Amino acid sequence: MVEKLDRRGFIMVSLGAVVLLDSQFLSCGGKNDMTAFLYSDIYLRHLTGDGHPEKPERLTSIYNRLNQSEWYGDLTLIRPESANLDVISLVHSHDYIETVRKECEAGYTSLSTGDTVICGESYAVALEAAGGVCSAVDAVFEEKAKNAFCAVRPPGHHATPDRGMGFCVFNNVAIAARYAQRKYNAERVLIADWDVHHGNGTQDTFYTDGSVFFMSTHQSPLYPGTGKIEETGAGDGEGATMNRPFPAGAGNSEIIGAFRDDLLPAARAFRPDFTLISAGFDSRVDDPLGSFEVDDDGFRELTEIMLEIAHVSGGGRLVSVLEGGYNIEGIARAAEAHVDELFKA
């Protein structure tokens, strides 16, 4: 049932997804050199309760701000599609996937595996989040877009292969990396995480795998307590993990410096075919869950560095996936700065 038209005249359905008929992509500008944007009201159905910081308003704030940007009409919009279990199983164990499904259906209010609030629709929404990010991967590899930003929830970087924690259900960025490797034969994938919290789930997924380079800047000490500088990978993955923990108060100089001086040379040596960002905007100066002081200009410069990395050997293919960020106005401003740089690339 059609409810309304958005300001560009695209038909919106009750779930908030753009009607795209036979295509999962809709290009406003009709070119393949545009930035893709993934958002749907489906992601608002993961309900966390009053007072919880990981709330639906995080996404609506981003959408409303981007929708007022002068370049919004030139973005390529992506319709989310639910990930099938084969895709989720690229990262997560069958037992864990079943735990999430059964506990959501049974009316649990939080996952038994960790501190992640759930509701009856959380399993379905998490499948849509992971599937939407995979649709963004399709967009850049099939040259429907040059890069993409995915405003999804629940977030994912704390989810390990067999455990949900830290507000996360399925690890969207890890699934996207494995999906790119399986479907598009990406031999080397680089993931950079600038969330204020360490991406322990992503690190765990690839710790012994040299085909995925993972780098994280994060506040320490802070939840989840992982990500020491000495954690550099093991076995075949030795040297493919890079952690740069910083104390409270770190800002543009420290975080940008780690990306420019440490990650960029490593990326040139690694030569990724595909680049992913875990874009956590809780490293912003005003976030209630962290004590970093990165500002919007800082996120612009971080984005520029990541775009440079994406062009090292991957033809610019880059997908950015929302993680944290809990100041409702701050997350929108940071996301706008980030997407503006993606768009200008």
Question: Which ranges hold each PLM region?
Answer:
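HDAC/HDAC-like amidohydrolase catalytic core signature
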Residues: 2-345
